[in-house]
Amino acid sequence: MKKLISLLLVLVMALSLFAGCGTTPDATEPVTEAPTDGAPALSGTMKVVATSEAYVDLFNKFTAETGVAVEMLSMSSGEVLSKLRAEGGTPSADLWFGGGVDAFMSAKDDGLLEQVNFDAAAELDPTYKDADNYWFSKGLTIVGFLVNNTLAAELEMDIPTAWADLLDEQYAGEIIMSNPAISGTNYGVVNCLLQVMGEEEGWAYFEALNENIAYYGRRGSDPKNKVIADEYAVGITFLDGTIDALLEQYDVTIVYPTDGIPYIPEGVAVFKGAENVDAAKYFVEWLYANDENLALLAQLDQKSAVKVIKPSMEGVELAYSTDILVDVDVALFGSQREDILAKFEVLMGDKAVTE
């Protein structure tokens, strides 16, 4: 039986970076034409590294209005940062679109991002942007559980409703989580719960949780995919409209943890030294200055969280109260990243999947 567990009234917020291996978006065939009035004279191709190809229509709109072609590469935030560092900070992509903001904070500290100043930046919530305009947020990713009802029934397993429940021995070997060193979403889980629980209690929690984790996947989508494939009973996963849609296709339960919903802002930035830096910088301004573009982003993202980023925008209404989110300091996502990941690597041991 498909059901939605939540004691909170909430709606879901609705290959290589350095080689030319991208694909041109084609979900809606773009019409390349002369730039529209108000757009600067831009040319060439803008290469975008993104966490998903769901944004094709947004980039096609940019192409139609500016004449700049777009190539997209799909990569998680941790992979982007690792490859950028490995190549000495010389990118072959221009725009970084999506992924946990912790990696963007680290990239800024490493001098790998371009400063992007524009008037509309003043309308963005300062909590979710860099004070010096080196990175911005396009929304928030919230995290909960996806449970395979068939497996849960076969294993006589209770549906977990809280983070504390996952420590029960009945879930041993049946929980999958993504490697937080690769998945910004799951790094957000670790950082948020450590902030909420405190260092000592938080690390004790993850040590205990590790006993029940089957393995740590290399992409943020692994928990969702493995649960619907009947491989594992419980996945720690992002929650959005794409997860909601699974209720119509699979015998699963979506769980919003009653003891707190972790989240992480999703970043947007321009790579320093990018080949088409002008197009990438203009895209950032084009996106945030026009509410129509942000509304399209919300539609494609199947989230309303862009309203949190730009509270003044019209055309999108926030589908939930931010009170449901855990109370954390966003700045710590970046400053604590290296220490947390180093400690978590030891904790994971041979359960971490890196390839």
Residue spans for each PLM region:
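Short, polar/charged alpha-helical segment
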Residues: P35, K47-E71, R85, F145, ...
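A ligand-binding cleft/hinge motif common to bilobed small-molecule-binding domains
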Residues: D102-S106, I228, A233-D251, D301
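Loop/turn elements at helix/coil->beta-strand transitions in domains of secreted/extracellular proteins
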Residues: S43-M46, T66-A69, P91-A93, Y171-I175, ...
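Conserved C-terminal helix/tail region of periplasmic/extracytoplasmic solute-binding proteins
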Residues: V326-E355
